[in-house]
Structures are given as structure tokens and as C-alpha cells.
Amino acid sequence: MENTNQFLGTERVGKLMRRYAVPCIISLLVGALYNIVDQIFIANASYLGSYGNAANTVVFPLTVVALAIAVMIGDGCCAFVSISLGKGEVGEARKSVGSVVVLSAASSLVLTALYLIFADAIISMFGGTVNEETFRYAQEYFFYISLGIPFYMFGQAMNPVIRADGDPRFAMISTLAGAVLNIILDPIFIFECKWGMMGAAVATVLGQIVTAVLAVWYLCRMKTVKPGKGDFRLHASLCTRMLTLGITSFLSQISLVAAMAAINNMLRKYGALDEIFSQEQYAQIPMAVVGIVMKFFQIVISIVVGMAAGCIPVVGYNMGAGKKTRVRELFTKLLLCEAIVGAVALVLAEGFPRQLIAVFGAANESSYYTDFAIKAFRTYLCMMVLACVNKACFIFLQAVGKAFSSTMLSMIREVVFGMGFALLLPRFFGLDGVLYSMPVSDVLTFVIAAVMIVKTYRELNTEGAAVL
């Protein structure tokens, strides 16, 4: 089969960034909207309110576990396919796509079974016992979300593979179709049918099914790396290489889950010691508030990750073809764009927190909810620029084949700093300590990331001149 991706090594870098990054950003934003839209409609339903918001916050990390596995498989395959095409090894690329289908199906079924069997214990582990209402809502939401895990994981795993095949537009459309259906069904199920948390979850699952079906349709019509019947099996050596390339994506997401578990439990623990939030009717507020702050953060990070991940096929192809100058140029543009995104997000979080929380039903809540939410936005997100640059650095290192460096940097951010400070700082500052944990982590991570950025520039500088 002819390699039709040669333009990745000749087209202007800026044009390639727009072509690949924009659809990827939209895909990730739309994917993020599943949970965000659920939370918006849940929060604005007076019969659910902050209890439903808190329940959504409890369950959200558990969907991230599924996403972590899916992106490890999909991003790893995307990088592998791009590098293989750059080397002219189309057959290897086809085999890797077949392995993705089998691997995503098997892993999603195992995860679904674990979620259904150990649901109550898992919900408790992620802070769902803050009060009885929150636990009950979390149980209901988690059950139906678990049933959709196989569709969700397959759609997410195939999305980067479709981009690597040279059709980022279809990758965007498949995700957009499911999200649009979710947005349409959410208000119908929550407000008209009064299905509550079940309605939000069912709307989400139906949207995920649509995305998965479209991914199957594309799989049968792939342009460059369509697998043959014999390719639909687990090729051990290829799987190892793919998962190695995708391990950073996995650890980045899964370590975020660990950090969120720590944060949720610290909110529950130190909220119980607070004069206001120790009262039963207000106990869920800290968790609900941090949940909406994280949703805003998720929107921003979707743009950041989409921009960087969208460049993976371009980086992989040019690295495989030995065109380091083009890779260096792309890295420079990427860092600049990510810093701009972070600056815009910072202005919104610091200058307009009241307007942001109003989207999540603040009108139905007490002044304690609003006051804590404003403080959370301004404190938790005060280092957004550094957070965006850090994230871009993680993904770019992965794209150029430095899986170990990327993995270590990601783990240091989320586990050593993120989880560590989430557990440590509340001992000294109470609930405020949870809010301080993110900016402190981002500053310390940037110090390490800056060293990696300089080193990467030097390695990509084929003429040996200093770049930074």
C-alpha cells in the first residue's frame, strides 16, 4: 500500500499544526463535554443540586481510569503508526491497528466487570461517603456509566488511530456526534423525564455508543493503515512497543486519578472539621465546588492536550524521517500557543469566577457555596500558564520517543507533587491546603520541565547552536 502521508514531511509546520491540532482539540473538548454537560444539567436541577454535583465529582475519576487505558492504547498506536509510516513500514502499522481493536475490547470488558462487582467499595474510596445523599446519587450514576465503558473506551482508543490514518476531521466528527446527542438528551432525561442521575448517565452512554459505531464504520474504510483479517489479534511485540509509547498518556491520566482520590478524601476529612461544612446540609459543598473548578480546568487542558496530541503524527513522521529541524520548529510554536491558552484561562479564573460558577447552578445554592467557589477558582488555578506548558512538554517528549522522560515527569507532577501536597498541605492549612496543592505542584514541576525543554531544544538543534 502506498504511503500517502508524505506531506507531513514537506508541508509548512504551522499549516500542519492547524490541520491536525484543531480537530484534535475539538475532539477532546467534545469528549470532555460528556461529563461537563452532565454536571451542568445536574447542578441546575433543583432536586439534585450540589448533592448531584458532588456525586458527579466522585464518579468522574473512575471514568478517567477508563480513559487512561484507552488513550494508552490509542495514543501509543498513533505514535507507532506515525513513526512506522515515516520509515515506510506500512505493514507494521496495519498490524498495530488490529491489535488496538482487540486490546481495547478485552480491557474494557474487564474494567466494566470490576466496576459492577466492587461499585460500593470504589465509590467509598473516592470520597463518596461525605453524606448519605451524595453516596446514593453516586451509586446510581456509577452503575449506568459502567455499562457504557466498553463503548467509551473503544471510541477513545480509535480516535487517535483515525488521526494517524490521516483523517483528523472524521475523528472530530465521530466524537462530536456522540456529544451532541448527549447534550440533546440530558435536559430531556433530567428535566422532562425526571430520571435524575440515571438520566444523565444514560444520555452519556447513548452518546458514547454513537461514537463507537462511527469508529467501527471508519475502521472498515481506513485509507492508509486498514488492517486485514489476520491483523485482528494481539501481536505481542507490537503491543509492547505501542504500550511503551502510550504509557505516558496512561500514567498522566491514572496518576491524576490518584491525585483526585486524595483530594476528594481530604475535602471530606477536613470539611468535617470546618465550622460550616461539618454541618450535614453543607458537607457536600467542598467536593461539589472543587468538582466544578476541575471541570473548567478540564476544558483548558483539553485544548492544551489536543494541541500537543494533534501534533503527534507530524512529530512522529518527521522524527522517523530524520527531519529534526521541522520538529524543533513545531516544538517552539507549540510552547508559545500553550502559554497563550494558559494566560487566557488565568484571566477568566481570576477575573470572572462568579460568572463561571453561575453556569453550574450557583443560584440554587447558599452563599457558603458561592464564597468557597470563588476562592477555589482564584487559588487552585493561579498557575494555569505553567500547568499548560508542563502538559505540552509531557506529550511532546512522548511524541519524539522519550517515553521514559515523559513518564517520569508526568509521575512527578501528579503523584509526588500533586498527590503528595494534597495530603500534606491540609495538615497545616485545612481546606485551603487542598486548594494550594495544585499551584505549588505546577511551580515545582515547571522547574524540572524547563530543564527538559532546554535539553530537548539542544538535541533537536542539528547544527549545535544554542537555541535557548
What is each stretch, according to the model?
Residues 19-38, 144, 178, 207-211, ...:
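Transmembrane helical elements of multi-pass membrane transporters/channels
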Residues 14-33, 37, 62-69, 147, ...:
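Residue-level signal for short hydrophobic patches within transmembrane helices
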Residues 24, 28, 40, 79, ...:
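Transmembrane alpha-helix boundary and packing residues in multipass membrane permease domains
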Residues 53-113, 152-171, 287-347, 351-353, ...:
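Small-residue-rich hydrophobic transmembrane alpha-helices
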